[in-house]
């Protein structure tokens, strides 16, 4: 099974067109299709050609209500706080970011991120898709080497050791890869990342 995961389109129609030309079994938009919630409606028709296989998370630029309405309108799957099984793997999604200085609509406190991640505890093998990266890795390194990721997400990864982790949010880290214990992680950015999941035999 092929999963295409991407993030931080921020209204870039050309980037989205390129992604939708990629053949995959599942598509995961990991947040920030728009800017402060504006322009989502212009992204919908581009994504719609993959509608039945499109799973969407809110980033920090969208609210839960924005994404719920967007998914209803265009026939996508709202994947915020949800799980599914693909080829024997659990796949889980959590949108929003930890607090930012910009007062964006999709932010949780670290405590709320921790509590929401708890529902994914014990799922193995796990593919975890979040908008926000873990703190203190190549995935959250911004300008001047500063790190802006989430402590709660890092703690969850270190404890639960998902097989794969995907995120966005920090634009400067797009395309970066990091390993936390047995977890392989990527900041997918607007170019996206393909994950080939072999079917697990039980």
Kindly give the residue locations of the regions a language model identified.
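Binuclear metal-dependent phosphoesterase catalytic core
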Residues: 15, 69, 83-87, 104, ...
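Short amphipathic alpha-helical segments
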Residues: 17-18, 40-42, 67-70, 140-142, ...
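Active-site neighborhood of phospho(di)ester-bond hydrolases with catalytic His/Asp-centered motifs
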Residues: 5-7, 27-32, 54-60, 78-80, ...
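Short, structured coil segments at secondary-structure junctions
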Residues: 23, 50, 72-75, 181
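Conserved catalytic scaffold of divalent metal-dependent phosphoesterases
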Residues: 11, 62-149
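Cap/insert and terminal regions of metallo-dependent hydrolase folds
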Residues: 34-35, 39, 51, 131-170, ...
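N-terminal active-site segment of His-dependent metallophosphoesterases
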Residues: 1-45, 49-50, 64-65, 122-124
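A generic local structural motif
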Residues: 13-17, 40-45, 65, 77-79, ...
């Amino acid at each position: 099974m092929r999963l295409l995961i991407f993030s931080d389109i921020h209204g870039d129609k050309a980037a989205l067109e390129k992604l939708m030309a990629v053949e995959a079994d599942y598509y995961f938009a990991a947040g920030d299709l728009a800017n402060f919630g504006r322009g989502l409606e212009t992204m919908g028709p581009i994504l719609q050609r993959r509608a039945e296989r499109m799973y969407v998370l809110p980033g920090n630029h969208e609210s839960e209500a924005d994404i719920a309405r967007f998914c209803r309108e265009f026939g996508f799957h709202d994947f915020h706080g949800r799980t599914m099984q693909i080829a024997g793997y659990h796949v889980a999604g959590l949108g929003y970011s930890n607090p930012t200085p910009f007062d964006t609509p999709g932010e949780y406190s670290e405590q709320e991120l921790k509590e929401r991640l708890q529902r994914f505890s014990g799922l193995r093998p796990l593919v975890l898709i979040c908008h926000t990266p873990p703190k203190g890795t190549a995935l959250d390194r911004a300008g001047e080497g500063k790190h802006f990721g989430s402590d709660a997400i890092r703690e969850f990864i270190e404890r639960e050791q998902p097989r794969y982790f995907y995120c966005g949010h920090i634009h400067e880290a797009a395309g970066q890869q990091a390993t936390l214990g047995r977890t392989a992680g990527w900041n997918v950015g607007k170019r996206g990342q393909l994950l080939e999941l072999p079917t697990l035999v039980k």
